[in-house]
């Protein structure tokens, strides 16, 4: 189930938890039930992280008005040359 939009979502903490779950699953020491519970939690975390990345991508896009039509243009990071 995708996460509900909330101000309390922490992408980095979710990614760290997902990494820990993967490590547990890779060790192979869990029972089948524990593995399924961890897998289910991991799927939820992946979906939440994907949604957070999608939301961030939308925020980065810049709305430009061209010829009276609104157009979404991807944000391009300026590279700094020293």
Swiss-Prot record:
Its EC number is 3.1.11.6. GO terms for molecular function: exodeoxyribonuclease VII activity. It is found in: Cytoplasm. GO terms for biological process: DNA catabolic process. InterPro entries: Exonuc_VII_S (IPR003761), Exonuc_VII_ssu_sf (IPR037004). It catalyses: Exonucleolytic cleavage in either 5'- to 3'- or 3'- to 5'-direction to yield nucleoside 5'-phosphates. Disulfide bonds: none annotated. The keyword Cytoplasm applies. It is an enzyme of class 3 (hydrolase). Keywords: Cytoplasm, Exonuclease, Hydrolase, Nuclease. One of its GO terms (cellular component) is exodeoxyribonuclease VII complex. It holds the Pfam family Exonuc_VII_S. It comes from the Bacteria. Belongs to the XseB family. PANTHER family: EXODEOXYRIBONUCLEASE 7 SMALL SUBUNIT. Heterooligomer composed of large and small subunits. Bidirectionally degrades single-stranded DNA into large acid-insoluble oligonucleotides, which are then degraded further into small acid-soluble oligonucleotides. This is Exodeoxyribonuclease 7 small subunit.
């Amino acid at each position: 189930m995708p996460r509900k939009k909330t101000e309390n979502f922490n992408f980095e903490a979710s990614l760290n938890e997902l990494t820990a779950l993967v490590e547990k699953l890779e060790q192979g020491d869990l029972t089948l039930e524990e593995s399924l519970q961890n897998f289910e939690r991991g799927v939820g975390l992946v979906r939440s992280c994907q949604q957070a990345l999608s939301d961030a991508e939308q925020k980065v896009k810049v709305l430009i008005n061209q010829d009276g039509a609104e157009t979404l243009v991807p944000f391009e990071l300026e590279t700094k040359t020293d």
